[in-house]
Amino acid sequence: CNPTTVLDYRKLLLEVDGVRNAWLEPVGTNGPPHLYLPPESTGPELQCWPEDGSVSRPNPVVLNGLYSVLIQKETGEDDKKVFMSVRERLAAHRNLCEDFKAITILCPLEIGVCADVEIDVGADAAAVYEAIIRALRSYIAPELKYYTLKELLDKGRAIEDVFAGRPFLRSRSVGFVDTKELEALHLRDELFGSDLYSAVLGVGGVVAIRSICFQTSVSPGGDTIQRVRVLPGFVAEFSLDRTCVQLQTTRGVLSLDKERIHRRLQEGTKPKRGLEHLDLPVPTGRYLP
């Protein structure tokens, strides 16, 4: 079956190799209309909205069912390959009176965090450091979790909600996503330093934060950044290379094997599960002689 809602389309696109996340935006609802009917036109000829202001009295037109598609790709994936795969998948499942104005592969904005954190004297420094990095990554670039059918049912999700809007695939799949978790993953345009404080202070063993700020690929050297704006066409991605978290106690600065911890924190690829993990078993029945 074809998608019927924006969330359904997002679930469909998550099955495409190389796609980490996807968003659909109705054209014309957020900002000025992109189509207009020329004043001199005598027929139903729509044109794109001119950016140079050459049209003085355009007649704006908003079409239902016209979307812009925004794609966050997996690290290292080829833009053109992902674009072609997304376009092919959308074309195969497009409904009548629906179309896609543009498919945009978002550029990654690498964001790290520099912090000086005090922890308890008796705390496991390596475990606290790993938990801090995970908390920072979860705030800057939260990841979707994929489930088997059993895992979602164990979370208390009703089976009709689990399968609602999920694409029917005949082979392997990445699994299920929790609809509530998917809805919560918005394409954000701002990140705030105050949220970094909340994320780190929520880690067990942390006593205080002496300093914390963002470090981005576009930030001037030496600046203390407490707010990051993510421009249109970009998506925030957490960068370990731009992150420097120093731990200390009342006894002094702690030394850690950070490279070893970083290897454990490397992002994995999306899972590929067989259909036996994505459906209920068929009852075997009883043999009656």
Question: What is the predicted function of each stretch?
Answer:
Residues T148-L152, R166-V228:
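C-terminal structured "cap/appendage" subdomains that terminate the fold
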Residues D223-R251, E259:
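Solvent-exposed, conformationally flexible loop/turn segments
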Residues N2-K180, V245-P289:
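Carbohydrate-recognition loop of C-type lectin domains
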Residues N2, P26, C213, L231-F238:
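Low-complexity, charged, repeat-rich alpha-helical/coil interaction segments
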Residues V19-R20, V206-V207, L231:
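Short coil/loop linkers at secondary-structure junctions
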Residues Y36, I159-V162, P220-L231:
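Eukaryote-specific, cytoplasm-facing alpha-helical/coiled-coil scaffolding segments in long proteins
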